[in-house]
Amino acid sequence: MSLQYHVLNSIPSTTFLSSTKTTISSSFLTISGSPLNVARDKSRSGSIHCSKLRTQEYINSQEVQHDLPLIHEWQQLQGEDAPQISVGSNSNAFKEAVKSVKTILRNLTDGEITISAYDTAWVALIDAGDKTPAFPSAVKWIAENQLSDGSWGDAYLFSYHDRLINTLACVVALRSWNLFPHQCNKGITFFRENIGKLEDENDEHMPIGFEVAFPSLLEIARGINIDVPYDSPVLKDIYAKKELKLTRIPKEIMHKIPTTLLHSLEGMRDLDWEKLLKLQSQDGSFLFSPSSTAFAFMQTRDSNCLEYLRNAVKRFNGGVPNVFPVDLFEHIWIVDRLQRLGISRYFEEEIKECLDYVHRYWTDNGICWARCSHVQDIDDTAMAFRLLRQHGYQVSADVFKNFEKEGEFFCFVGQSNQAVTGMFNLYRASQLAFPREEILKNAKEFSYNYLLEKREREELIDKWIIMKDLPGEIGFALEIPWYASLPRVETRFYIDQYGGENDVWIGKTLYRMPYVNNNGYLELAKQDYNNCQAQHQLEWDIFQKWYEENRLSEWGVRRSELLECYYLAAATIFESERSHERMVWAKSSVLVKAISSSFGESSDSRRSFSDQFHEYIANARRSDHHFNDRNMRLDRPGSVQASRLAGVLIGTLNQMSFDLFMSHGRDVNNLLYLSWGDWMEKWKLYGDEGEGELMVKMIILMKNNDLTNFFTHTHFVRLAEIINRICLPRQYLKARRNDEKEKTIKSMEKEMGKMVELALSESDTFRDVSITFLDVAKAFYYFALCGDHLQTHISKVLFQKV
């Protein structure tokens, strides 16, 4: 039984030619007297059956069993009851899912974030001036949002730190106004029964400032006669931690310049409010913290504080989050998630608006989670820097000098600590360094070593977020650097790592970001991945037929190499709609291998094949595009074999050109010949130079838009020179020998840095071409560096459905 694949937007069959009035350009050659003789590549119809037998033959071949044993998993995907897989993504459900995400992206404001019971309780404590709550809606929210066990906090993830500080704050607020005694007593009971459990909690997941804020709440509770075990050993330990931390707080500095201490004023004493009010944020808050701002208002009755709190309470219908706004954080992290999930192409316009927004608030000192902040952090700065640079915005690497001191990098200016995710995002950003950006070179070395050490100690736990698989994300990044990270490989792993709505952030309390951690994104990504994978499996079947029918094994191309060629193309150019680009890359790679394997040994044999190729084309033109193999000169050694392979090459180029003409009305036949002729001139002289440039040209020729006028552009020439130094087959061999691997990879890295600078700093007019160069270079770099991962990645990316 075979799997049936329904091809949406299928390539017209050759029989369509006879029934159409379209005139094919004269540059399509006619070989051996047939109307259009192309390298044989069948199975072009509206509904195509992907042969189980052919795939089974591939799996059972001794060669593949030796080289790629993990492909046996593909057998399990083609059982007797295998379902039909729809290739494409134009179903109504898929379109609606895309539309829903677009709606989210088009309506981003100050950030969607869950309400914090702790911060709401601080707002509820504010006196209107007449012994009544200034924010009765906050009191009401507390009363209506108690959990069934008597606590307050995140309802889906139980953390004693989170539940106890939220519960104590809410109990204090209700008792202060003598309201809702039943809820208050339930909360006290929960607190008394569970306070001892703090001893067993992981300090890494302790809320921000817990050791300062929690004792302060206990003092308020004691003052209003709330009966809790104040002499509990665990509370004594927390008091000791508070005193230690308070002694380390630079009181003089915190009153002069904005620091993260402004976020947690409610836990401090002996504050000079006249000085602190000068450090207030533009929106009236103290570093965007409702609880800190509520405490400040109680001490100062400042009208700007009150206005901020009123806006927050109104925005969240009575409650307030632990931090607000979070606009920059939300904009940046959404783009990152959509990009890593492999679905960003559906939202290009919306993503540009997101990044325009972030760039508008970018400063030389960096950014933080909210706009117009006087305090910046390395986490948001690194994430924004990476995305902005990737998308062509001009941002300076000097921004990271603000977070560096004596060779180390820190989360906040003036502090001396790191967080795993902060260093992870610094590491990711540092890999987009341009040559001569020493600060990023230092950042890469520091963050890599930091993460490596944390992984070795099994300490990949973060103080900012509880994630599904943070160790997996970091492990992937450490093993597959960005230069070698292919889009489909990253997405295949990230789909398994992304926790969606189950990921929880850690602030003063646990909180969630529904537009950042969204199950809808995950489901859309899974469906899109499976759609693309089905298309790839269909193409892989066609690709094998082309290989067999043209007997390419006779020219030294093994089946395992065939799969590697297709995989590199599909893992890089993965989109279903880019089939022409993907297939031309894969076939061109195989043909280069066949030609080099059969005729690359000596300059004479290379020259012989090159002459045969050019003679094929010249004869065709002399005979009005009709010629027969009998017209070819066969007096040179090996010319029969050369003639056959040249025929396969030209036939394949004809088919590529024909397919593009039928689907997009563009005739690129002569340009295909010229591109291969240019490659042969380099190959004839040097043996293995020019393959990278050839692949880029092939891909560009197959694009929907005509970019061929860039082939003579000085920028193109510079990029071509670089990629031809990266994409040298002899380098792969050296890279896989332990004694030369490090030296070879460093040499390639140097060229990759030049490539990144040229590709990412280019204007919109040349950007598509530049990114194509970068994509191809990354694929070659991946092949040289990641040989140990190749089998696993091929199996996972091409054959394992998500």
Swiss-Prot record:
Reactions performed catalytically: (2E,6E,10E)-geranylgeranyl diphosphate = ent-copalyl diphosphate
Activity regulation, short description: Inhibited by high concentrations of magnesium.
InterPro entries linked to this entry: Isoprenoid_synthase_dom_sf, Terpene_cyclase_plant_C1, Terpene_synth_N, Terpene_synth_N_sf, Terpene_synthase-like, Terpenoid_cyclase/PrenylTrfase
Cofactors that this protein relies on: Mg(2+)
Main location (coarse class): plastid
Motif (DXDD motif): 377-380
Resulting phenotype, H331R: Reduced catalytic activity, but loss of inhibition by Mg(2+)
Protein name from the UniProt record: Ent-copalyl diphosphate synthase, chloroplastic
Species, as recorded: Arabidopsis thaliana
Designated gene of the protein: GA1
